[in-house]
From Swiss-Prot:
Disulfide bonds: none annotated. Keywords: Cytoplasm, Methyltransferase, S-adenosyl-L-methionine, Transferase, tRNA processing. InterPro entries: Alpha/beta_knot_MTases, SpoU_MeTrfase, TrmL, tRNA_m1G_MTases_N. It catalyses: cytidine(34) in tRNA + S-adenosyl-L-methionine = 2'-O-methylcytidine(34) in tRNA + S-adenosyl-L-homocysteine + H(+); 5-carboxymethylaminomethyluridine(34) in tRNA(Leu) + S-adenosyl-L-methionine = 5-carboxymethylaminomethyl-2'-O-methyluridine(34) in tRNA(Leu) + S-adenosyl-L-homocysteine + H(+). S-adenosyl-L-methionine binds at L83, G109, I130, S138. Could methylate the ribose at the nucleotide 34 wobble position in tRNA. It comes from Mycoplasma genitalium (strain ATCC 33530 / DSM 19775 / NCTC 10195 / G37). It is found in: Cytoplasm. One of its GO terms (biological process) is wobble position ribose methylation. Gene3D superfamilies: 3.40.1280.10. One of its GO terms (cellular component) is cytoplasm. Belongs to the class IV-like SAM-binding methyltransferase superfamily. RNA methyltransferase TrmH family. TrmL subfamily. This is Putative tRNA (cytidine(34)-2'-O)-methyltransferase. Its EC number is 2.1.1.207.
Amino acid sequence: MYKSVINIVLFCPEIPNNTGNIVRSCTAFKANLHLIKPYGFFLNDKRMVRAGLNCWDKIQLFEHKSWEHFLQATTENKTIWLLTKSGDKTPDQICMTNKLPNELYFVFGQETKGLPKTIMDNFKQNQIRIPIWNSVRSINLANAVVCILYEYSKQNQYSNLDKQCA
């Protein structure tokens, strides 16, 4: 297992295949994964298990009963960023270096609804967006997570990754 300062948070994920793919991506980039209930599937859903491949014994996975439980259960030294279409900043405009004293948490909303307004209102200054062409409503959740994981790795000179392929 690994200890990471980067945390991916899925708020009430709905699609098991997306979550399984995110398990695999978080493992590949050595990121912790937090799932906030309720889910739109069971954790043993065969589509999720298949999408996660052989990463289930390697992932740092945390489950939370609610948003409030997530906030209480995580470290006090944290910076929370919400991913949203209306964010003022893009991932390259925020500091993600692992030299920060805080753990980084990147929160992604539900595939169909995004994040609730109450959460968005509490983190107005910490909203980022992944730039895409305006004619497209959104990108797939699993792909959005990889965009953030890659930017984190890039800002840290890929120090969280192996430099050579297996």
